[in-house]
């Protein structure tokens, strides 16, 4: 069954997925030596994940990108213990990875309500410090957003990902006949006749060695982590980044893309995946597509086409392999239908797994309750 879709236009022209900010905890308050009074602690700086917050909104609202905790209150005759400084809470989107200026990971905020302290307030003045307060912690941190979408497009540059996205969703990514057209994530949304919506993300193209952070490297791969399934897009005629790089066939391209995902994070290979073989309007495309299908039926038998170090530990098993042409529209309705089918299957599986987890949890709780009741029940004595 082929699903037709009514595209929904949604623009993300000024989308940003990383932000550099300055954070500083508030200084502590002065102690009171003659009465032994303690100064108040300086306010911390915390990040809190909230819905409908974007990095762009933060940048627009706080152009100086400086966040400072409140100063702790001084000790006084009326209040020997100074008031703590006000905590500076910065609302950020969920799916944020926080790192230091030197790339050291501080933590992640994956869901709404998660929070993390990124700068500690200074201690108030006490006897041990001659009643002198300490300054708050200060540093520059980076906020990196891992984009959430249902489907993430995976491919080398110029495979036609942007053209494909524009045809199935009416998003408006930049499209041209040269590599690295996409330098920022583009989001499109497919709307089906029953009003089901599926979001699709076109992400910057990979190159060999992306897991080492070459090219767009980690800027691309971090977003793949938060997609529910993968849509590989390969050129049926193969791929060559430049005259100085090796030509790769469509099959070799699939293996290399798999390897990049594996080396970045093995779990990415467990995501449901589809394969769109693009540019089927080219000469001899059908013969090349049939050759690719045969190679994918027995991937291990064709590993010799690549050096051992470029062969993934295990090939991805695609749910569907769809020949398409973003230029002519060939196969696009079939692709849209396959995306919907796999998303529905995945949703059904997740519901079953959740129900099974709840059942097991209920059984364990019931078992504990029975044991507790037996233990607490009065023992009968037999005469």
UniProtKB/Swiss-Prot annotation:
Residues 369-383 have a biased composition (Basic residues). It comes from the Eukaryota. Coiled coil: none annotated. It comes from Xenopus tropicalis (Western clawed frog). Its main location: nucleus. May be involved in the ribosome maturation process. GO terms for molecular function: GTP binding; GTPase activity; magnesium ion binding. Residues 362-383 are annotated as: Disordered. SUPFAM superfamilies: Obg GTP-binding protein N-terminal domain, P-loop containing nucleoside triphosphate hydrolases. This is GTP-binding protein 10. The keyword Hydrolase does not apply. Residues 13-148 form the Obg domain. Residues 149-344 form the OBG-type G domain. Belongs to the TRAFAC class OBG-HflX-like GTPase superfamily. OBG GTPase family. It is found in: Nucleus, Nucleolus. Keywords: GTP-binding, Nucleotide-binding, Nucleus, Ribosome biogenesis. PROSITE patterns: G_OBG, OBG. PANTHER family: DEVELOPMENTALLY REGULATED GTP-BINDING PROTEIN-RELATED, GTP-BINDING PROTEIN 10. GO terms for biological process: ribosome biogenesis. GTP binds at residues 155-162, 202-206, 278-281. GO terms for cellular component: nucleolus.
């Amino acid at each position: 069954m082929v699903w037709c879709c009514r595209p929904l236009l949604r623009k993300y022209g000024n989308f940003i997925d990383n932000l550099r900010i300055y954070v500083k905890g508030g200084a502590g308050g002065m102690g009171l030596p003659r009465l032994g009074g303690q100064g108040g602690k300086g306010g911390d700086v915390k990040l809190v994940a909230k819905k409908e917050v974007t990095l762009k909104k933060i940048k627009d609202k706080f152009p100086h990108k400086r966040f400072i905790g409140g100063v702790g209150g001084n000790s006084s005759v009326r209040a020997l213990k100074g008031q703590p400084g006000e905590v500076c809470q910065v609302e950020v989107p969920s799916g944020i990875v926080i790192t230091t200026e030197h790339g050291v990971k501080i933590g992640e905020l994956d869901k709404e309500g998660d929070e993390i302290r990124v700068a500690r307030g200074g201690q108030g003045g006490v006897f041990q410090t001659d009643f002198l307060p300490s300054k708050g912690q200060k540093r520059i941190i980076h906020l990196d957003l891992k984009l959430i979408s249902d489907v993430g497009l995976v491919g080398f540059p110029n495979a036609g990902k942007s053209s494909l996205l524009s045809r199935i969703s009416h998003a408006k990514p930049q499209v041209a006949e040269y590599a690295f057209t996409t330098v920022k994530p583009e989001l499109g949304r497919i709307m089906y006749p029953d009003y089901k919506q599926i979001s699709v993300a076109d992400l910057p193209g990979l190159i060999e060695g992306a897991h080492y952070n070459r090219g767009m490297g980690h800027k691309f791969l971090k977003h793949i982590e938060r997609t529910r399934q993968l849509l590989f897009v390969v050129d049926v005629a193969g791929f060559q980044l430049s005259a100085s790089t090796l030509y790769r066939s469509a099959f070799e391209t699939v293996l290399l893309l798999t390897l990049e995902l594996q080396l970045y994070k093995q779990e990415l290979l467990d995501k449901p995946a589809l394969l769109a073989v693009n540019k089927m309007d080219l000469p001899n495309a059908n013969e090349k597509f049939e050759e690719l299908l045969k190679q994918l039926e027995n991937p291990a038998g064709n590993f010799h086409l690549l050096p051992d170090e470029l062969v993934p530990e295990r090939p991805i098993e695609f749910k569907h392999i769809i020949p398409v042409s973003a230029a002519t529209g060939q196969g696009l309705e079939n692709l849209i239908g396959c995306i919907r089918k796999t998303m529905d299957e995945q949703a059904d599986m997740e519901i079953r797994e959740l129900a099974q987890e709840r059942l097991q949890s209920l059984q364990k709780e019931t078992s504990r309750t029975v044991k507790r009741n037996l233990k607490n029940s009065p023992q009968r004595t037999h005469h």
